[in-house]
């Protein structure tokens, strides 16, 4: 029996994608081979690779000024790869910290140059909001400004992207990429690990503006130098072939759903249902300011935290799994990515209401 999986990542996948991958496991397209067995330079995999790139560019409306790269290392790896690619000319970068992931980025970049905390969304209740542009204190001519546009742990999402003029904006969009349309032209660099909305763990998508390919540090490994990867069409080293194949299936699934505008409407409906349930109750609490609440990652706390394990056990018995909050913040977290159906969220809120009534 399939469960409703609320994991933050690796996360729920579209069942249609899983079934197609299963059907093609031993023989992709009449080739007599699994995708796992293909040469990454063979015509079969090159077809998969090019279709994935084309479909992703179409879904996100990526302009011709930007390259799409398939890399390895995950979002966490990009915390080092970004400064090594952008600090070659200016060894200073600014950071807007809105949660745990941008904190990690801020700390990692200190190994490669001077970093400046331009703004923080931390309050007495933890990370609960996104500082407005007027609150940012930018340094003089930084190499880039880094922003995590969706904080997976704290459930904080950035919806308003400021115009920084000539300063490149770097966005870690790992946990909400493909959940809604985005104006890619506003970003110098946008990256995301695959294991949320793109597919399975193993491939990292990096979208980088052409003019930023000439700014790498000499210490940057060639396998992670964006210019080298771009010139070689993400084939400089052996790419994560099966992860790219799965991502390609997800892209086609998204197109069949109506693209990102249609997906956004579904995600708004799911998030509203869950947040309304939390807000209408004195038994559950979400601490994030309403205009910064993530549509993808919804953390919440029980008024009586001694009942956390009972809540999780009861949820699991209902087929509602992976609801435990991150160890650094506790409580619960429901990650409701694209592949989590509305029926799953309805089942969760029904259980939440019943659990509250039993404890009343």
UniProtKB/Swiss-Prot annotation:
Which organism was this protein described from? Paraburkholderia phymatum (strain DSM 17167 / CIP 108236 / LMG 21445 / STM815)
Q: Reaction catalysed by this chain?
A: O-phospho-L-serine + 2-oxoglutarate = 3-phosphooxypyruvate + L-glutamate; 4-(phosphooxy)-L-threonine + 2-oxoglutarate = (R)-3-hydroxy-2-oxo-4-phosphooxybutanoate + L-glutamate
For this entry, the protein name equals Phosphoserine aminotransferase
Xref: NCBIfam families: PRK05355.1, serC_1
Recall the GO molecular function terms of this protein's record: O-phospho-L-serine:2-oxoglutarate aminotransferase activity; pyridoxal phosphate binding
Q: Which PROSITE patterns match?
A: AA_TRANSFER_CLASS_5
Which cysteine pairs are covalently linked by disulfides here? none
What gene makes this protein? serC
| Cell compartment(s), UniProt | Cytoplasm
| Record note on cofactor | Binds 1 pyridoxal phosphate per subunit.
Q: Which CDD domains match?
A: PSAT_like (cd00611)
Q: Report the EC code(s) recorded for this entry.
A: 2.6.1.52
